[in-house]
């Protein structure tokens, strides 16, 4: 049987987990894997929320060239420009590449221009550079507060964003940071979200937890409050209310980072996919795990689960094996608050809305502890270490071989264990 050529576009959570999982389950003779990316490292994006408060960026970057070479994965530093579906080729800035199976993991991008004034007057939190600039403004703000000048920081979450949690983290971390500097009394923190409840995608238990945190910390917050326009020092909301600010922080609406003509997508360019395998609708040879797909919640943990499903589908297609029954994923997320953290385990309901929380499940819970923050940092270190070695997050001892895995329980384990 001829070798199956798999081209993976992107080197984020979804792209790397797919590539490394494939290599853990198939030899180079069986499956060729090529990763096409604009960068030669992996960025642990969840950790970038710490950048405005003095954390170093360098530890968040994981070099990949040795991992790719060690695992027999080809890499091309290039930009994806389009797909020729009829010929089975992806066009890149370095030329065309043929594929048997294509994994589109090019992620999401922010579009601040959808809301007048946001691009000009708000700090986005979508990139490390933007978070560094926010940190500079926060330090100026803190200096003003130390000299007795009252300051106002406003956080705003508009519609069209599918990853709300980092904005909540930044607001809570800012409160802790200001208290450490003993200037919290001179800074007003406000939080407006278009959601009906706080961190709505995570259900009522996260809403209750965040509500308690906001109240205890004196953060003036509103739900169902939609940012309509931003000016130099004021924000106008859809209900006509106005908030003044010295620093405005927003997580703008999201769209697909790359548009692909000929592939079905929603109104924001996210590719429509089969919920089980993440195969693009009508194109069984193309997959879209992670943020590039249409799953309405964008999280690193979900990207890893979806990548494992994609790798399993590709291996099953090659071997003729039957795919195991789909398990409804259990989302796990840590909300960093700088001094401690909240941990949430969120089982999603089967059927209907794929991101609907199963509120009746005994596995649905949330709590706050300094231990969760330590655990999150350990998990970050573990993932970075495995990616540095060219290994998927969880693949057992089989990942150290180029041959197929003996066990096939890894994806289920990732879904079910804390």
Where are these regions (language model features)?
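A conserved FAD-binding loop/helix module that cradles the flavin
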Residues: 289-339
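Beta1-alpha1 glycine-rich phosphate/pyrophosphate-binding loop at the start
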Residues: 2-73, 159-201
């Amino acid at each position: 049987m001829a070798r199956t050529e798999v081209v993976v576009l992107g080197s984020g959570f979804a792209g790397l987990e797919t590539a490394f999982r494939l290599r853990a389950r198939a030899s180079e003779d069986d499956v060729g894997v090529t990763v096409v990316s604009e960068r030669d490292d992996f960025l642990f994006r969840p950790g970038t929320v710490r950048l405005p408060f003095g954390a170093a960026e360098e530890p968040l970057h994981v070099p990949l060239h040795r991992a790719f070479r060690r695992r027999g994965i080809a890499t091309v530093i290039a930009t994806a420009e389009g797909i020729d579906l009829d010929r089975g080729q992806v066009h890149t800035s370095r030329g065309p590449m043929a594929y048997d199976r294509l994994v589109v993991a090019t992620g999401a991008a922010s579009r601040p221009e959808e809301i007048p004034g946001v691009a000009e007057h708000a700090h986005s939190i979508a990139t490390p550079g933007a978070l560094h600039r926010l940190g500079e403004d926060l330090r100026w703000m803190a200096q003003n507060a130390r000299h007795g000048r009252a300051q106002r920081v406003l956080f705003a979450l508009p519609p069209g964003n599918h990853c709300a949690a980092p904005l909540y983290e930044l607001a809570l971390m800012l409160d802790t940071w200001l208290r450490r500097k003993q200037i919290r009394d001179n800074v007003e923190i406000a939080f407006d979200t278009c959601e009906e409840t706080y961190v709505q995608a995570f259900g009522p238990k996260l809403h209750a937890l965040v509500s308690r945190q906001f109240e205890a910390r004196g953060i003036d917050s509103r739900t169902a409050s939609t940012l309509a326009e931003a000016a130099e020092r004021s924000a106008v909301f859809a209900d006509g209310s106005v908030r003044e600010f010295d620093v405005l922080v927003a997580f703008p609406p999201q769209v697909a980072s790359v548009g692909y003509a000929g592939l079905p997508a929603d109104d924001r360019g996210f590719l429509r996919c089969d919920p089980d395998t993440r195969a693009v609708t009508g194109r069984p040879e193309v997959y879209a795990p992670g943020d590039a797909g249409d799953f309405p919640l964008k999280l690193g943990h979900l990207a890893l689960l979806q990548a494992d499903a994609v790798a399993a589908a590709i291996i099953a297609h090659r071997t003729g094996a039957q795919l195991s029954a789909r398990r409804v994923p259990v989302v796990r997320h840590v909300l960093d608050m700088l001094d401690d953290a909240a941990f949430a385990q969120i089982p999603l309901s089967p059927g209907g809305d794929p991101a609907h929380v199963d509120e009746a499940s005994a596995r649905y819970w949330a709590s706050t502890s300094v231990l969760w923050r330590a655990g999150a940092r350990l998990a970050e270190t573990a993932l970075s270490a495995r990616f540095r070695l060219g290994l998927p997050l969880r693949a057992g001892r089989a990942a150290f071989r180029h041959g197929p895995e003996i066990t096939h329980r890894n994806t289920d384990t990732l879904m079910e264990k804390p």
